[in-house]
Each structure stands twice: as C-alpha cells, then as structure tokens.
Regions:
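Walker A/P-loop-proximal flanking segment of P-loop NTPase domains
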Residues: 1-87, 94, 99-100, 138, ...
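P-loop NTPase motor core
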Residues: 51-52, 79-84, 92-146
Length: 146
C-alpha cells in the first residue's frame, strides 16, 4: 500500500499549519437549511467539490433519488443510517438536501452527473424537502416551517 502522502494532497489549511475549528468539520443541517452554515456546507457546488462519493454515500443517494422519481424496485421509503460518530449520516442528509433544494447547481457537478446517470436520471426529481433536526428545536417553543 502506498503511503498517504503519495496518494493525496492535504487541503491548504492542513499544509499551512492552520489550527482547526472543530465546528468546520461537523455539519449542522439546520444551519445549512437556514443559510447560516459555513459556505463550504451551505453552497451546493462547494459542498460537492469537497464530498467524496463513497460507495455507501452513492448507494444511499441513489436509492433516495430513484424513490423520489417514483421507482419502488430496489429502493426503500425509509432508510436507517446507522454509523458511529463521524460516519457520514449528516453529510448524507446534507447531500440529499442540496440535490433536491439546489437541483440545478447540484446536477451540474461531475460527480452528481455520474450519480444521476447511474440512477437512470437526467436531473434530480422535483420534490419539496422538509428538514427537522431533533436536537435543534425547543419543545416549549415549537417549530413552524413554511
């Protein structure tokens, strides 16, 4: 196996020795939806530029996109994303949010184009996402969404 430094180049922040803010690496989906997240997560193009389309991510996104397109074979109406901390659950949900909420921008990204082609789709299906983050609301105040 090749050493990591021969396979990939660390991001500029790492190469420059910049100290890290852990908040930059933990996506808060409610902040993405509210337009308050860091630009790398809020902007669909930048988000997908930084996303590695792993097999698990590709399978989950493909299943949901096919289901939204009305396909029921080899899809599920409910997905259970069970992973450890940092396993990609919120990243998957954020990717889905961008795919349906910012479909034109998302569909122009080369990795998304490949995903759509593999799903037999030319663009993300039209849908209206609803986002509820259970630990980001006050049960006494409630939450209204348009």
């Amino acid at each position: 196996m090749e050493p990591w430094y021969k396979v990939t180049t660390p991001r500029a922040e790492v190469r420059g020795g910049r100290s890290f803010n852990p908040d930059e690496f933990a996506i808060a989906l409610e902040q993405v939806v509210a337009g308050k997240a860091p630009l790398d997560y809020r902007d669909a193009k930048q988000f997908f530029d930084r996303t590695v389309f792993t097999r698990a991510l590709t399978e989950h996104l493909g299943m949901v996109l096919r289901r939204l397109a009305g396909q029921t074979q080899n899809t599920s109406s409910v997905l259970s994303l069970i992973t450890q901390f940092g396993g990609g659950k919120t990243h998957t949900l954020t990717a889905l949010y961008h795919l349906v909420e910012h479909s034109k921008t998302s569909a122009s990204h080369p990795d998304v184009q490949k995903l759509l082609k593999d799903c037999g789709l030319s663009q993300p299906p039209k849908s209206k996402p609803a986002v509820f983050v259970g630990n980001a609301w006050d049960p006494a105040e409630g939450k209204e969404t348009p």
